Amino acid sequence: VAWLHAFLASLADLGFPSPRPLPAFGGQSWTVAEGLLWEIVSFIPGHQVGWDAEPPMVQIGALLARYHGAARRIQVSSQRPGVIPLADVPAILLSPKLDLACPDPDRAAVIRRLAGRLAADLEDRGHRTAARLVIHGDFTNHNVIADGKPPAATGVIDFHRAHLETPLADIAYGLWRSGRPRQDAGCLDLPLLQQFVRGYASTAPPLPGAASALPVYLYGRGLQMIAKRVLEGQPGSGMLAQAEWTAANAAEITDAVATALR
């Protein structure tokens, strides 16, 4: 939490609309009491966008680009402790630990196949040497705040998955949920995805290779969530269906992103 609050303080100092840590505990913004972690940050007025149709995805994509612009100006000296960077996911899912969290051999075989593909795809795209910044880590519409009439995307909350990663991964992690047509869908709404990408591109400098890389980071997000459960020793591979769909439709997603960026 010290890593995160230091970053959030720097982000707020740059004027980005995000929670600012408040020194309410003897000069600190967090403390441990009775075995529990307590933290306090400032309030961002407005309401959670969630599944609302407004503000449009173009605005939300542009807000993420604004965040990345601010994050590039903040230097951090180390990775956030306790996170699972995407580059670490294949090794976790190809280890014997997977069998404990996923006792179904057929599902485990699918996960291992996708994990091997992820390792190859990341290597092909030079992921390990790509430029990094502190990504939000969960930039879904449920963590975007809207205010005004008509509603406009005005702020971002819940940075608890923030860590060093490539900015393209942040786009994909947000679209993993908010790019679906509805919460229980196991697929993406490509026109919705295109709106988000257009909004991002309207504000951010070009991201080389975005069209072909975005599907990789999308199905990688699903595998990352499975890897987290594997390390925790918990069963759970419910996100596998969407990861499979995304990997199977990578060409269509690439075409949709390329069209949006023209």
Please name every model-derived segment.
Residues 206-218:
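All-alpha amphipathic helical-bundle segments outside canonical DNA-binding/catalytic cores
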Residues 21, 119-169:
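Active-site acidic catalytic loop and adjacent metal/ATP-binding pocket
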Residues 71-78, 126, 208, 233-234:
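Long, hydrophobic, amphipathic alpha-helical segments used as structural scaffolds
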Residues 25, 51-109, 130-132:
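A cross-family kinase active-site recognition segment
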Residues 168-204, 219-237:
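Active-site activation/catalytic loop segments of kinase-like enzymes and analogous catalytic loops
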Residues 97, 225-262:
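ATP/Mg2+ or Mg2+-diphosphate-binding catalytic cores
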Residues 1-78:
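ATP-binding pocket architecture of kinase catalytic cores
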Residues 62-72, 119, 176-179, 258:
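Short amphipathic alpha-helical signal-transduction/dimerization elements
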